[in-house]
């Protein structure tokens, strides 16, 4: 199977706002249930161990007209909650049995309450995370939070989630994280062979497919990508930062690369890479998931940094690891976490002589020429003067 065949399948999944693949998975067995989740991170291992399908919801993108969703939020709020409400009210998510709202920002917290009011018969949970990273404080708190989620899913499914089932799920998601890192690593080494639009669509597919199917898709893509013959261009190597929640249109990603930039790392859909290393399968699986969050999770604006000096360390590590020549801060309009963190990260870049530019977008942005011109000018300036 060629990379083109695989990406064609991924693009069809990306454009399908009725989530047909997830619907078909559920219809194949009447006992199956689907648990949807918003960005940035949820422990999908627990959902999987319950025999359920985790379904990532990234809003409606540029393919959904928002009609009812605008009535729920003010004009100065980002678009993803509006389009998510539209997905719900238009019955595109009527097959979903539950919805998780991770701790991202006040808007998503409020959306969880709205969802409870709009869909009273559904399982809805706001999933909180610790802001203290001591094992005996934040660790105990987060383990209790995980166990509450476990109990809620047990009640919904009518069956116990055993420790052995959790360990098996951790193992399959460890494999998924490894394969995702392999794809990102290949793109970083040879970005001319692995277009960022391909990587993006591969990751989007992983939000709607069973993890086992996604693992095979990633293996197939890696096997095909190494055989690709593509011409290396004199492009600038950049990192995208700030796009961890509301997603950019696919054309925006393509426009950045067409402007003369190779995207060598990003924070799109970081649920796939939120935990940097394997989660242990020995001992208590809930405690292992808790400790992995405390000590192995990446830094993002949606996660609390308990030490000021840690702010920007992860971004600078990305720059070094990927031999990046610049950073593009691309955040959704009105995204409080990303836009509040941006000046701090920009200061770290300036202190370390890392060039950067910034712009804002919405998931339905249509005019790409200004962004392409800005990114192209940035790439040219790095080639000429960096």
Curated annotation (Swiss-Prot):
Molecular-function GO terms, alphabetical: ATP binding; benzoyl-CoA reductase activity; iron-sulfur cluster binding; metal ion binding
Record field: catalytic activity: cyclohexa-1,5-diene-1-carbonyl-CoA + oxidized 2[4Fe-4S]-[ferredoxin] + 2 ADP + 2 phosphate = reduced 2[4Fe-4S]-[ferredoxin] + benzoyl-CoA + 2 ATP + 2 H2O; 3-hydroxybenzoyl-CoA + AH2 + 2 ATP + 2 H2O = 3-hydroxycyclohexa-1,5-diene-1-carbonyl-CoA + A + 2 ADP + 2 phosphate + 2 H(+)
Enzyme Commission identifier(s): 1.3.7.8, 1.3.99.n1
pH dependence, entry free text: Optimum pH is 7.2-7.5.
Keywords, sorted A to Z: Aromatic hydrocarbons catabolism, ATP-binding, Flavoprotein, Iron, Iron-sulfur, Metal-binding, Nucleotide-binding, Oxidoreductase
Iron keyword on record: yes
Swiss-Prot/TrEMBL cofactor(s): iron-sulfur cluster; an oxidized flavin
A biological-process GO annotation: catabolic process
Endoplasmic reticulum as UniProt keyword: no
Group of enzyme by EC: oxidoreductase
Family matches, as PANTHER family: 2-HYDROXYGLUTARYL-COA DEHYDRATASE, D-COMPONENT-RELATED, SUBUNIT OF OXYGEN-SENSITIVE 2-HYDROXYISOCAPROYL-COA DEHYDRATASE
Oligomer and partners: Heterotetramer composed of A, B, C, and D subunits.
Function: Catalyzes the anaerobic reduction of benzoyl-CoA and 3-hydroxybenzoyl-CoA to form cyclohexa-1,5-diene-1-carbonyl-CoA and 3-hydroxycyclohexa-1,5-diene-1-carbonyl-CoA, respectively. The enzyme also reduces other benzoyl-CoA analogs with small substituents at the aromatic ring.
Family the UniProt entry places it in: Belongs to the FldB/FldC dehydratase alpha/beta subunit family.
Entry protein name: Benzoyl-CoA reductase subunit C
Organism in which the protein naturally occurs: Thauera aromatica
């Amino acid at each position: 199977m060629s990379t083109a065949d695989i990406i064609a399948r991924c693009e069809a999944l990306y454009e399908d706002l009725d989530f047909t693949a997830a619907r078909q998975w559920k219809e194949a067995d009447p006992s199956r249930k689907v648990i949807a989740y918003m960005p940035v991170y949820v422990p999908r291992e627990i959902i999987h161990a319950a025999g359920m399908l985790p379904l990532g919801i990234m809003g409606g993108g540029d393919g959904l007209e928002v009609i009812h969703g605008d009535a729920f939020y003010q004009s100065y709020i980002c678009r993803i909650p509006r389009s998510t409400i539209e997905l719900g009210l238009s019955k595109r998510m009527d097959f979903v049995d539950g919805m998780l709202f991770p701790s991202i920002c006040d808007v998503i917290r409020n959306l969880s309450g709205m969802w409870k009011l709009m869909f009273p018969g559904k399982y809805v949970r706001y999933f909180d995370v610790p802001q203290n990273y001591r094992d005996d404080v934040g660790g105990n708190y987060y383990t209790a939070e995980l166990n509450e989620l476990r109990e809620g899913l047990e009640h919904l499914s009518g069956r116990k989630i055993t420790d052995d089932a959790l360990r098996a799920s951790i193992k399959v998601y460890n494999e998924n994280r490894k394969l995702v890192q392999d794809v990102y690593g290949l793109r970083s080494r040879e970005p001319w062979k692995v277009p960022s639009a391909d990587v993006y669509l591969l990751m989007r597919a992983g939000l709607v497919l069973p993890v086992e199917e996604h693992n095979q898709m990633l293996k197939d893509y890696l096997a095909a990508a190494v055989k690709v013959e593509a011409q290396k261009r004199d492009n600038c190597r950049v990192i995208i930062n700030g796009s961890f929640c509301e997603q950019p249109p696919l054309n925006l990603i393509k426009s950045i690369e067409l402007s003369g930039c190779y995207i060598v790392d990003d924070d799109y859909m970081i649920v796939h890479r939120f935990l940097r290393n394997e989660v242990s399968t020995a001992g208590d699986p809930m405690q292992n998931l808790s400790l992995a969050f405390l000590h192995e999770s990446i830094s993002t604006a949606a996660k609390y940094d308990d030490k000021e000096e840690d702010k920007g360390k992860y971004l600078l590590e990305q720059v070094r690891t990927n031999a990046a020549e610049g950073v593009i801060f691309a955040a959704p309009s009105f995204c409080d976490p990303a836009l509040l963190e941006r000046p701090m990260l920009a200061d770290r870049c300036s202190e370390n002589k890392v060039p950067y530019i910034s712009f804002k977008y919405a998931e339905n942005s249509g005019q790409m020429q200004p962004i392409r011109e800005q990114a192209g000018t940035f790439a040219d300036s790095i080639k000429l003067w960096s």
